[in-house]
């Protein structure tokens, strides 16, 4: 039995109040808070799932949607292997913002990043809310930009797990394992350098001069 764990760094992006934090809460705790406080800066959560008999650990960065925090986003999506770009199906402005995030990710994030476009709050359509972003619009954008596409309800849990499982299935686990191995090797090398420096200050100074 394979007991290795593959870590996947995932970031959530989107306008304020589209339900990013609620999606994460539903995925991690299977819970929903009706009046959740806005995220300040970013929140970090983890969740483990089994995909094709392999354990995957999602390291989730839930970023704030307020405009004043937008400049911090690159710090969180840098080196991310996956991103959720979330919009509210009842708010067309949030879909426009989602387009912006997709464009920014393609320009500045890793070229191999897996992006899922997520239309949230479909439960509101059963509660008398009016859909302002057609499903076809989301599907078209996803097809044009090579994205995964889902419509979800963080409130009811509909399709939320499917989003994360879909992303996990798209990321080659071998590649993720190689990245983890390379990271561990770099850390090991750094430790060896520190050890040598401690034993021989002259060598360390010589290296710095180069």
Curated annotation (Swiss-Prot):
Location in the cell reads: Endosome membrane; Mitochondrion membrane
Key words of the record: Endosome, GTP-binding, Lipoprotein, Membrane, Methylation, Mitochondrion, Nucleotide-binding, Phosphoprotein, Prenylation, Protein transport, Transport
**A GO biological process held by the record:** protein localization to endosome
InterPro entries for this protein: P-loop_NTPase, Small_GTP-bd, Small_GTPase
- Give the modified residues of type Cysteine methyl ester: 210
Membrane topology, from the record: Lipid-anchor
Q: Where is the lipid attached (S-geranylgeranyl cysteine)?
A: 208, 210
Q: For binding GTP, which residues are annotated in this chain's numbering? A: 14-21, 62-66, 120-123
GO CC terms, sorted: cytosol; early endosome; endocytic vesicle; endomembrane system; endosome membrane; late endosome; mitochondrial outer membrane; mitochondrion
Q: How is its activity regulated?
A: Alternates between an inactive form bound to GDP and an active form bound to GTP. Activated by the guanine nucleotide-exchange factor (GEF) VPS9 and inactivated by GTPase-activating proteins (GAPs) GYP1 and GYP3.
Q: Which GO terms describe its molecular function?
A: GTP binding; GTPase activity
Q: Where is this motif: Effector region?
A: 36-44
SMART domains in alphabetical order: RAB (SM00175), RAN (SM00176), RAS (SM00173), RHO (SM00174)
What function does this protein fulfil?
Required for protein transport to the vacuole. Involved in two vesicle trafficking steps to the prevacuolar compartment (PVC), regulating the docking of endosomes and Golgi vesicles to the PVC by interacting with PEP7/VAC1 on the PVC membrane and promoting SNARE complex formation. May be involved in recruiting the MON1-CCZ1 complex to membranes enriched in phosphatidylinositol 3-phosphate (PtdIns[3]P) or other charged lipids, leading to recruitment of YPT7.
- Family label: Belongs to the small GTPase superfamily. Rab family.
The record's misc note reads: Present with 8759 molecules/cell in log phase SD medium.
- The name this protein goes by in its record: Vacuolar protein sorting-associated protein 21
Species for this entry: Saccharomyces cerevisiae (strain ATCC 204508 / S288c)
